[in-house]
Amino acid sequence: MLKRKPIDIESFRHLYPFESHFMDVNGFKYHYVDEGSGEPVVMVHGNPTWSFYYRALIQSLSDRYRTIVPDHIGCGLSDKPDGKTYDYKFKTRVDDLEALIENLEIKEKITLVLHDWGGFIGMAYALRHPERIGRFVLMNTAAFLPPANKPIPMTLKLIRRLKPLATLAVQGFNLFARGALFKNSYKGLSKDVKAGLIAPYNCWQNRIATLKFVQDIHLTQNNPSYGLVKKIDQNLELFSNYPMLICWGEHDFVFDMDYLAEWQHRFPEAEVHHFPEAGHYVLEDVPDKIIPIVNRFLDQHPGIEDRGQMTEDR
């Protein structure tokens, strides 16, 4: 049996100087960052990243806001159970996020910062609890079915269809996470940042979530998560009067400019900034531009108080 390797936290501590917090979720340790005090800003990461991706934004906001950044189960510093003991599905991710926010007893309006899969997970949570949401900050993500006639990149299709080969490639050789280090940044990442992003995915057992996220992409109605995505897609207009900031890297092989156009079609009042010098990891490529924009947006939009009620069927 393959032995699980420990994560060398000290190797990236200089870039990620945050205290670790853990919550029990159905017997598994759910890791999160909880820095600062004030109005809560909850940041939700995607695949194959973890809370490390938001480190610069945490450091910028935590002097005035309470920044809460979980690692999904199977990601970052959270436990990485096998697929028999944990259900690596979209709905479970939303349940976990909901459990964390309930456990922290957050009473103030929440700003959701969402990237990649975080858009689906965060928006699903928001539809369960629209009265708890104050603002949205979106970065190269989606929360709707693919735009009309939009093909899924061949890389993702192959991982989904060629399961034995994909398992070997993703869990055995870590090709998805390693490839993301080069493909998802337009400017290129430093050696230290690459090491930090990939550190939690250092052995077969620790890469299961990377594989499961891709396998759960909702391409057809046969996918277990398709119904939940469709429900979000059909109800996004609930947030039409919520303050929304969209920051977009133009060089994204999945969430390209067509996805940005779809967001703008659905939310014409959103504040939008797109960056020709950035890719999918937009916060890595242009943090010096995005962080001041986010700070200004939060200052200018204190949020709205009257919320409609909508509860998602569990």
Regions found by a protein language model. Give the residues of each.
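Catalytic histidine-centered segment of alpha/beta-hydrolase-like enzymes
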Residues: A278-P287, I291
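Residue-level detector of flexible, active-site-proximal loop/helix-junction positions
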Residues: E39, A143, G279
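Conserved HGGG/HGGXW glycine-rich cap/lid loop of the alpha/beta-hydrolase fold
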Residues: V33-K80
